[in-house]
């Protein structure tokens, strides 16, 4: 039994002293160090002692870091990988290093980085990613790095940074973002304001400069002139017809999304109907209502016709098209959305009572009812439903109906005499 214990301890001692052949392992200043720098390595060698806290793989020829590359060294506190040929850091390559405090990936060729791995590195204090090929950093990349003190992103290919990127870094004291080809458009204005007001040390600010547009090339971000910028706004309204459109006979639902903002926002329709969700990210028809070249539709006339001016037409509107129609606008400064619920009810079959029960008490403060002439009629907080009767020709006649408690809500707009459409207007 005693011999068995001796063999067991000998095995443990051997494992503790194991070290990959190209590397030097030992203790220094109370840290377990594995030095594999300048070894002409093309991959991370296996066989490290599990108690290693500092690992240097600098100045090798590593082309990438695969998933689980450092699974053998879970207690690692410092990892040095500078001056390699790393292009890709795969998801899971760094995620297991929850004790890591210093990470140096500088002077590589990294363009593909698993930013989600950083979410597990909450102890990180130093992150060096300068002199790489990074073009994009997600807004939430640093969300867990509340202990980070120094961040180096200089000498990359970053064109912009999302507002709020550095907000989670409450301990940050040093930031380098110079020598990046920034696009000085509305999306970068926040960075100028933040850099001028933050207590974080940001050296070489004259080298944080614009690459585009051409008129601003070379201008330091700190001296960027005021730009005409505004976040998107949207107003979703009903229109009885679409000028110049060739519509098929029958009922027509026409919506118009009025979008404002600088730079000009991108318009996107999100339609939720019984059969699923329809996304329309660009116009799919011309003014004649026929599909534009390249539009993926089965016929020459799409079911949901999105025009370049912000209008959306649904000819022959029926039960299959009931649902929620949302207009979304997005630019560099943010997004805005407005929605309308659309359903059919047959007059004389309890449709009005159904609508009254469904929407009773759901007041939308500050909304307005749109007439056939697309003029907004002021409505009080109790005006929350617009009832629309469309004629077969698609040319409704307007009349306003007053409601009382227990019946249809007030502020209803009645159009025509055949098919009932109701809209519950909401804005986000």
Curated annotation (Swiss-Prot):
LRR repeats lie at residues 51-72, 75-96, 99-122, 123-144, 147-168. Changing residue 183 to N: In a colorectal cancer sample; somatic mutation. It is found in: Secreted. It comes from the Eukaryota. GO terms for biological process: cell adhesion. Coiled coil: none annotated. Residues 232-343 form the Ig-like domain. Expressed in various tissues including retina, heart, skeletal muscle, prostate, ovary, small intestine, thyroid, adrenal cortex, testis, stomach and spinal cord. Residues 180-231 form the LRRCT domain. GO terms for cellular component: extracellular exosome; extracellular region; platelet alpha granule lumen. InterPro entries: Cys-rich_flank_reg_C (IPR000483), Ig-like_dom (IPR007110), Ig-like_dom_sf (IPR036179), Ig-like_fold (IPR013783), Ig_sub2 (IPR003598), Leu-rich_rpt (IPR001611), Leu-rich_rpt_typical-subtyp (IPR003591), LRR_dom_sf (IPR032675). Glycans are attached at residues 51, 309. Disulfide bonds join 257-327. Keywords: Disulfide bond, Glycoprotein, Immunoglobulin domain, Leucine-rich repeat, Repeat, Secreted, Signal. This is Immunoglobulin superfamily containing leucine-rich repeat protein. It comes from Homo sapiens (Human).
């Amino acid at each position: 039994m005693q011999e068995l214990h001796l063999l067991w301890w000998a095995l443990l001692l051997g494992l503790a002293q194991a070290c990959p052949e190209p590397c030097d392992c030992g203790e220094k200043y109370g840290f377990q160090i594995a030095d594999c720098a300048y070894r002409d390595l093309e991959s991370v060698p296996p066989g490290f002692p599990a108690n290693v806290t500092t690992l240097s793989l600098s100045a090798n020829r590593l082309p990438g870091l695969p998933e689980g590359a450092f699974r053998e060294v879970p207690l690692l506190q410092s990892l040095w990988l500078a001056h390699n040929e790393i292009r890709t850091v795969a998801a899971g390559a760094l995620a297991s290093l929850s004790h890591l405090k210093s990470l140096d990936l500088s002077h590589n060729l990294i363009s593909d980085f698993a930013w989600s791995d950083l979410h597990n590195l909450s102890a990180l204090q130093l992150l060096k990613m300068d002199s790489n090929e990074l073009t994009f950093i997600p807004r939430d990349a640093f969300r867990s790095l509340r202990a980070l003190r120094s961040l180096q992103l200089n000498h990359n290919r970053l064109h912009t940074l999302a507002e709020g990127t550095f907000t989670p870094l409450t301990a940050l004291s040093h930031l380098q973002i110079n020598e990046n080809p920034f696009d000085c458009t509305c999306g970068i204005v926040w960075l100028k304001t933040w850099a001028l007001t933050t207590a974080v040390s940001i050296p070489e600010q004259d080298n944080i400069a614009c690459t585009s547009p051409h008129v601003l090339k070379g201008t330091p971000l700190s001296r960027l002139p005021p730009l005409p910028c505004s976040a998107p706004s949207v107003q979703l309204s009903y229109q009885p017809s679409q000028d110049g459109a060739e519509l098929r006979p029958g009922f027509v639902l026409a919506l118009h999304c009025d979008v404002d903002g600088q730079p000009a926002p991108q318009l996107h329709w999100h339609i939720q109907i019984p059969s699923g969700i329809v996304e329309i990210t660009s116009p799919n028809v011309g003014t004649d209502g026929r599909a534009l070249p390249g539009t993926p539709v089965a016929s020459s006339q799409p079911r949901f016709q999105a025009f370049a001016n912000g209008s959306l037409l649904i000819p022959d509107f029926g039960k299959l098209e009931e649902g929620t129609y949302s207009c979304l606008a997005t630019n560099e400064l943010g997004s805005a959305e407005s929605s309308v619920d659309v359903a059919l009810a047959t007059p004389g079959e309890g449709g009005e009572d159904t609508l009254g029960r469904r929407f009773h008490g759901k007041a939308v403060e500050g909304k307005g009812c749109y007439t056939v002439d697309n003029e907004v009629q002021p409505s009080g907080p109790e005006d929350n439903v617009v009832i629309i009767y469309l004629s077969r020709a698609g040319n409704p006649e307007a009349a306003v109906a007053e409601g009382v408690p227990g019946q249809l809500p007030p502020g209803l707009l009645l159009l025509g005499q055949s098919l009932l459409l109701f809209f519950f207007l909401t804005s986000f």
